[in-house]
């Protein structure tokens, strides 16, 4: 099997395609969460604690000199990134929890007993007839 045909067989497998779709959706979800945290969550929090814009919070380690930019420790962006992570982790946790609950409900649901075969039905009838004859005597 040639290299190209092996690659084609690998690339069109369901798991690889599903994984690629998951990665793309995950990246888009990450952007949505980042926007949600930066544009919706952080401004009210900043307002509540005195009008602070978290994205601007930083400690200047070395001031800018000429063409050399300042060296800063941007801890406000780090706080936003941590909040992004917490929200994504919580969303994934809730999704996994819901899937696990569905799996448990599916496993707990009682399955119907198998329908007896014609042979089993016949043997049951014979047994019942023999018991009935035995009880008469």
UniProtKB/Swiss-Prot annotation:
Cite a single GO BP annotation: monoatomic ion transport
**GO cellular component, as recorded:** membrane; plasma membrane
Where in the cell is the protein located? Answer: Cell inner membrane
Main location class: membrane
Which Gene Ontology MF annotations are present?
mechanosensitive monoatomic ion channel activity
Q: Which Pfam families match?
A: MscL
Q: How does it sit in the membrane?
A: Multi-pass membrane protein
Query: Which PROSITE patterns does this one have?
Result: MSCL
Coiled coil residues, start to end = none
Name the keywords, alphabetized.
Cell inner membrane, Cell membrane, Ion channel, Ion transport, Membrane, Transmembrane, Transmembrane helix, Transport
The residue ranges crossing the membrane are 9-29, 79-99
Assembly and binders = Homopentamer.
HAMAP family (UniProt xref): MscL
Protein task: Channel that opens in response to stretch forces in the membrane lipid bilayer. May participate in the regulation of osmotic pressure changes within the cell.
- Which PANTHER family did the record assign? LARGE-CONDUCTANCE MECHANOSENSITIVE CHANNEL, MECHANOSENSITIVE CHANNEL MSCL
Family note: Belongs to the MscL family.
Protein name as catalogued: Large-conductance mechanosensitive channel
This chain's source organism reads Pseudomonas aeruginosa (strain ATCC 15692 / DSM 22644 / CIP 104116 / JCM 14847 / LMG 12228 / 1C / PRS 101 / PAO1)
Q: Which gene encodes it?
A: mscL
